[in-house]
Structure formats: C-alpha cells, structure tokens
C-alpha cells in the first residue's frame, strides 16, 4: 500500500480549524495509508484536536504558521507577502516533496497564483484550470473546466483544458472520455470565434474524443464526460447549478420536516425522492483540482463543512494514486506529437 501525505491549509475556509481539523481526523480513518500535515496556528489546531480527544502522532503532524491569507487579499499582494502564511507553507511542502498534495479552502486567486509560482506549470501548459466533477441524471460524473482559475482564455488555453480534462476523466472512466465545448447552441455555426477555433483544433486531434458542442441545459444530463469552457462561464454555471440543487433540497426538506398533515403526506410521498436529490448536494462533490501544475493542489469550498472537506482530501488522495500530473503530461505529449506531424 502506497503511503502518501496531504498538506492541509488548516486556516483556509470560512471556519478554519473548527472544520479542517475534524476533517483531517476523519480522513485518516478512511485512508490507512494517509498522513496529514496540518498547516496553521498551532494553538488553535491543538485546541481542536483536544476537543476530539486526539493529538499529533506519526500520521498527523502540525506545521505552525503565523499568517492567514484573507479572502479579500489580491493575488498579487498574497504572492508578495506569502511567507509564513498557512496557504503558502502548505504549497511549499508539496514543492519541497514533503507532501504529495495540498488542500486549501482559502482565497482562490491567491491559491492559483502561489501554486503557479511555487510548483510551476507542466511543459506545454500556458494556464492552470480548475476542474470538478458534476453529478448527472444517469449517476455518472461529468468533469467541467475551467471553473474560475482564469476569467478569460484564448483558444489554445481551451484546447489545453480539454487535454487536461480528458486525461483526468480517463483515469476514472478507464476509457476515452467524450469531450465537448459549452456553447449557446449545438450547431457548428453557433458561438463566438473562441469556441469555434477551439472546436476546429479538437476536431483535428484524433487523440481527443471530441463530440462537438453542448448547451447549458445539458450540463447534468451525461451528454459528455468532459465539458470545456472559460473560467468566467464555468464559475457562473457551477454556482447556478449548486444554487438550484440546494434550493430543491431545502424546499423538499422543509416539506418533509413540517409537522402538519401536509408534512406527513410529503414524508410518505417524497422520502425516496429526497434521498435521490441528496446526491446533488454540492458538498458531495467538494474538491476542485487545479490542473496543469507539476504538483497536486485541491481547492475546497470556503463554506465547506467537515464532510465536504473530507471529500476534498479524498480527491487529493485519489489524484496522488492516479498520478494525475504525469497522466496529463503523457496525454499532452501525445497530442502535441500528433499535431506536429
């Protein structure tokens, strides 16, 4: 069994050690091969461990940091003043090969800037991209990128996102994933020059199973295994999907918990539906991977609870086991070789 180490930014996210420390302890129980390094204020971390009746040991260690990068801090400022920060030190542990992956729920822009600066990009990649799995009506997953690492992208970057997304999805599916570009229509004439140019590049690449365009109403229908878009569009779509799913879950939960005859009827009729809808809960898919780097970095939701952070750590574990950066490099090399000839 391969031992692996995850550096967890214990101060990242809205709740800091109150959530990250219990999540680390739970993750250790899920993965016997896992070691976690908690990076943050040692006093706060130790305090939370004491509440759990736990203490640092050979599988759970603490690296003290004096500073936290705030959510309002600009990436350029965070980059200049990252020394001693929990996020910066967690990324450094990966750069120094003391950890196999980093997980943080902190400032997304700062995380991308620091990761890109400390870990460097893979050869052939111009920009990293955030990717996450989305649930679909069939029960399968769809991987969508970019989800906000870049506000705007050119056609070459979208093409690289497609290559990276395909490499990641292939490790899960064990077959060539269906790759599509998010567009305002499925017809070839639809869309702006950006998506048309990227579609042309993907059509000419046999190493990618490109199936064309899909529309926003197909995101959760299992129409594609990988959906490619720029970060602005992707982030808006992701949050719209999450908000809609949460609305349905909350509405149904309110009906099921009602004490009136209406609530009793709802519990009888919709309890199975509620169980199905819970599979759409965004917390179950927490953990967006920052692809294109020489190391593994996972972005957790800032508002994530304990179970959601456990899911982000789990994603880090799976990516380490699947050697995702190496797989992306291999896929990119094959694609570039094909385009060269």
UniProtKB/Swiss-Prot annotation:
Assembly, per entry: Homodimer. Probably interacts with PlsY.
Main location: cytoplasm
GO molecular function, one term: phosphate:acyl-[acyl carrier protein] acyltransferase activity
Taxonomic placement: Bacteria, Pseudomonadati, Pseudomonadota, Gammaproteobacteria, Vibrionales
GO BP: any one term: fatty acid biosynthetic process
Cell compartment(s), UniProt: Cytoplasm
Parts of the chain that traverse the membrane: none
Name of the top EC class for this enzyme: transferase
Role played: Catalyzes the reversible formation of acyl-phosphate (acyl-PO(4)) from acyl-[acyl-carrier-protein] (acyl-ACP). This enzyme utilizes acyl-ACP as fatty acyl donor, but not acyl-CoA.
Catalytic activity: a fatty acyl-[ACP] + phosphate = an acyl phosphate + holo-[ACP]
Gene Ontology cellular component annotations, sorted alphabetically: cytoplasm
Name of the featured protein: Phosphate acyltransferase
Matches recorded under SUPFAM superfamilies: Isocitrate/Isopropylmalate dehydrogenase-like
Listed pathway(s): Lipid metabolism; phospholipid metabolism
Species annotation: Vibrio cholerae serotype O1 (strain ATCC 39315 / El Tor Inaba N16961)
Keywords noted in UniProt: Cytoplasm, Lipid biosynthesis, Lipid metabolism, Phospholipid biosynthesis, Phospholipid metabolism, Transferase
Pfam families hit by this protein: FA_synthesis
E.C. code: 2.3.1.274
Family: Belongs to the PlsX family.
């Amino acid at each position: 069994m391969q031992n692996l180490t995850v550096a967890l930014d214990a101060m990242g996210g809205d709740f800091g050690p109150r959530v990250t420390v219990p999540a680390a302890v739970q993750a250790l129980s899920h993965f016997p091969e896992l070691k976690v390094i908690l990076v943050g204020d040692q006093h706060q971390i130790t305090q939370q461990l004491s509440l759990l009746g736990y203490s640092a040991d050979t599988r759970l260690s603490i690296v003290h940091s004096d500073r936290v990068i705030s959510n309002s801090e600009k990436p350029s400022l965070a980059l200049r003043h990252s020394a001693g920060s929990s996020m910066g030190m967690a990324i450094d542990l990966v750069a120094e090969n003391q950890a196999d992956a980093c997980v943080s729920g902190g400032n997304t822009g700062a995380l991308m800037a620091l990761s890109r600066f400390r870990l460097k990009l893979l050869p052939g990649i111009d920009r990293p991209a955030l990717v996450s799995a989305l649930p679909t009506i069939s029960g399968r997953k769809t991987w969508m990128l970019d989800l906000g690492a870049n506000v705007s992208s050119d056609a070459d970057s979208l093409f690289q996102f497609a290559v990276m997304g395909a490499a990641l999805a292939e490790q899960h599916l064990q077959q060539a994933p269906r790759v599509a570009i998010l567009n305002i229509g499925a017809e070839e004439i639809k869309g702006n020059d950006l998506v048309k140019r990227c579609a042309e590049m993907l059509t000419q690449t046999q190493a990618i199973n490109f199936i064309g365009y899909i529309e926003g109403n197909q995101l959760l229908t299992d129409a594609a295994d990988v959906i490619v878009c720029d970060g602005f569009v992707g982030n808006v779509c992701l949050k719209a999907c999450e908000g809609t799913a949460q609305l349905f879950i909350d509405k149904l939960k309110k009906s099921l918990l009602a004490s009136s005859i209406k609530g009793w009827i709802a519990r009888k009729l919709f309890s199975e539906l509620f169980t199905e809808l819970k599979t759409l809960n965004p917390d179950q898919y927490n953990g967006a991977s920052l692809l294109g780097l020489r190391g593994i970095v996972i972005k957790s939701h800032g508002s994530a609870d304990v179970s959601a952070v456990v899911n982000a750590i789990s994603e880090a574990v799976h990516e380490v086991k699947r050697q995702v950066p190496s797989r992306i490099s291999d896929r990119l090399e094959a694609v570039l070789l094909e385009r060269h000839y």
